[in-house]
């Protein structure tokens, strides 16, 4: 009887040990970045370049550091809203009052974006777009 109870104890203790061997993996959130709805980055630059109206900019707004160069670069920072529109614009390396910046904001505001999501919920994401303004003809 003693041998039988020891044998049963060993069998049942091994079964409970097997039940504890479950693998628990941490859940990683699914994050999707915002992107231009009109295609890839090249398509975005093509759109900005073709829709940037140099009639809306002033020659005196060309930065002094770029006077003898054929172009200058500045950056437009913005967020993508829940409905895929660009908003909350801010300039980098240029004044917010500069006509080149204002024209770039006008063009970027006319674009549509696929929104950023985290676990299929809207996530506000900021984008930085470099703008190369060709000033060789001014």
Write out the residue ranges for each language-model feature.
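N-terminal signal peptide c-region/cleavage motif recognized by signal peptidases
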Residues: 12-16
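Charge-biased low-complexity segments
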Residues: 5-6, 17-138
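Hydrophobic helical h-region of N-terminal Sec-dependent signal peptides
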Residues: 2-10
């Amino acid at each position: 009887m003693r041998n039988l109870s020891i044998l049963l104890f060993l069998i049942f203790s091994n079964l409970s040990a097997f039940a504890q061997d479950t693998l628990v993996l941490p859940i990683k959130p699914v994050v999707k970045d915002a992107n231009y709805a009109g295609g890839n980055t090249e398509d975005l630059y093509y759109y900005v370049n073709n829709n940037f109206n140099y009639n809306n900019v002033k020659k005196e707004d060309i930065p002094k550091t770029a006077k003898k160069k054929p172009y200058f670069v500045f950056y437009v920072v913005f967020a993508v809203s829940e409905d895929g529109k660009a908003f909350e614009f801010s300039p980098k390396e240029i004044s917010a009052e500069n006509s080149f910046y204002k024209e770039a904001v006008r063009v970027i505001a006319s674009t549509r974006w696929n929104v950023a999501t985290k676990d299929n919920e809207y996530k506000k994401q900021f984008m930085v777009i470099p703008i190369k303004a060709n000033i060789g003809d001014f």
